[in-house]
């Protein structure tokens, strides 16, 4: 990857994903930056794909939104044709295919895909070339080196979703402290057997001080 392309992917943003025993937690900051310019301080980097699936976005906003639209379409189509939710692994493979088909003029995005299906919780990282990795925990963006410090210290294989919310929030909060491309608040979503839930400010404040 050239330095210029890598900078486009890594500059700005911190997103975190954690697979818990009973669900998946997705977390991200709210700052959109262009170089040293803060373009937006209320950016939603967590997107619902279906009732049982969501993703986080890092990289180019337009490219990421295009991918979200395609995934939502196919998730809805699967529900109609198969009378049920699309497996998370299938969504991850579809995302990989979208990236791979455009490798000549790649989408500038890095995706964390999480959800809860018949198999249970699942978390994947899909990069701009279509590589797919299943993860227990992962972070992307320019603040990821800082966030990994918190994740590697606090992650346990037996974390519940309630516990994982705190770990994810603390990881992104640490990145906000040390990374200029990360900031302006934190969003967090939980995906489990009850569906996709984006936490309110009051719910987040009940977990950690923001």
UniProtKB/Swiss-Prot annotation:
The active site is at 13 (nucleophile). It is found in: Cytoplasm. The formation of the proteasomal ATPase PAN-20S proteasome complex, via the docking of the C-termini of PAN into the intersubunit pockets in the alpha-rings, triggers opening of the gate for substrate entry. Interconversion between the open-gate and close-gate conformations leads to a dynamic regulation of the 20S proteasome proteolysis activity. Residues 1-12 form a propeptide. The 20S proteasome core is composed of 14 alpha and 14 beta subunits that assemble into four stacked heptameric rings, resulting in a barrel-shaped structure. The two inner rings, each composed of seven catalytic beta subunits, are sandwiched by two outer rings, each composed of seven alpha subunits. The catalytic chamber with the active sites is on the inside of the barrel. Has a gated structure, the ends of the cylinder being occluded by the N-termini of the alpha-subunits. Is capped at one or both ends by the proteasome regulatory ATPase, PAN. NCBIfam families: arc_protsome_B. This is Proteasome subunit beta 2. It comes from Cenarchaeum symbiosum (strain A). The lineage of its organism: Archaea, Nitrososphaerota, Candidatus Cenarchaeales, Candidatus Cenarchaeaceae, Candidatus Cenarchaeum. The gene is psmB2.
